[in-house]
Amino acid sequence: NKNISKRFKNVQKIQDTFTHCFFNSTQTNEKFSELTSDKEVNSSRYNFFHANYLYSVGKEKEAKIIIEESLKLYPRNLILNQFKIDLQDKKKVILNNNFDCKNISHNIAEFFYILANAMSKQYKFALSNFYLNLGKYLNPNFISFDVLQAENFYMTDQLDKSKTIYERIGKKGSEYYWFASKQIVSILKEENKEEDPLKYLYERYKKISEPNIYQKFDYANFLKNNDEFEKSIKYYTEVLNLIDENNYLYPKVTDGRGVAYERINEWEKAEKDLLNSLKVSPEQAYVLNYLAYSWIEQGINIEKSLQMLKKANQIKKNDGYIIDSIGWALFKLHRHEEAKEYLELAVLLMPSDPVINDHFGDSLWMNDYKIQARYYWNYVLNLKETDQKLRNSVKNKLLFGKNSDL
């Protein structure tokens, strides 16, 4: 297996680099550069170790350069962003992540982390936590161990344990504070307890004295995803006022704001934002789908929408939403036999989605499968996710059938 072979070689490189560092070899800096130069591997973690090494030998300026260059590739990386802030804090004596490659215990702890991470990716969470606990014993003050353990507990529905760890992580620095706040909100939503996730994150966001563009973007996304569309637009706009088209956030922010505008029926603004998002980053399957489907629903640009959706389907194969949109475009073009094939596949991929089942029912009706169409419409009425507007439409079709012009 090529992947296993490559991972093994990477572990060998890490071991070699840490060995040079442990013995204070003159080649240590060169070894770190070799380790982090492989473009096929996410080397953000080892960029941290490289910068941390340079800082430990008094080369703070070089350490900062490594961090800045790495953040261009991995702008949201947690450990690098916190390290950058730690180095800016002149009063800080102890860094938030304690790692010393001249300490054999710390080096061994990192290899236990590599094993733990590999086990977690294979959904072997108990084994992952076993290796993490060994790593934490050898290096108790390295936050990556806590982050992975909290994720493992979350994935195994041990929400209280996960939340307790995130609360501890949140006290370790401003980047960790916001990261932990977002994770705790996810837990609160899962728990369905009295504590309001919206209020919780609002209170946490308010405590950040000068939110950066990423924190503003995260908060805007959270508001949009919780149907607070007008509020989200305010924060998306704040981000857009601080960045240009070259910033990697630009297509994400214009997409997010475009969706929010569409949801409050400000279509011209929505369309402009979605087009701007695609202008900068044309390979976004879900943005292509959102814009095309919106056009189809308005009865405009349907042929163009179909081409966009076929492109989206090439980028993101077997996605139920995209396949449904292709079927719906064909339906609107009165290509009913083709539409039925796509909509049938969409239902197989997303059997509990009310809109997709409704579309398939319409398609069956237009292909003269009237009994089967009624079966699917009745099924839509029995789905608890079906909103009132769709319920009314389906009830009308059950009484009078599907009008070919609709």
Over which residues does each language-model region extend?
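C-terminal soluble interaction/assembly domains
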Residues: 297, 304, 315, 332-334, ...
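Conserved structural position within tetratricopeptide repeats
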Residues: 37-38, 72, 136-137, 170-171, ...
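Hydrophobic/aromatic packing residues within the alpha-helices of TPR/SEL1-like helical repeat arrays
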Residues: 32, 67, 132, 166, ...
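Flexible internal linker/loop segments at domain or repeat junctions
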Residues: 97-102, 305-309, 315
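Feature representing long, continuous alpha-helical segments
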Residues: 268, 289-290, 307, 328, ...
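Alpha-helical solenoid repeat scaffolds
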Residues: 1-164, 171, 175-193, 211-228, ...
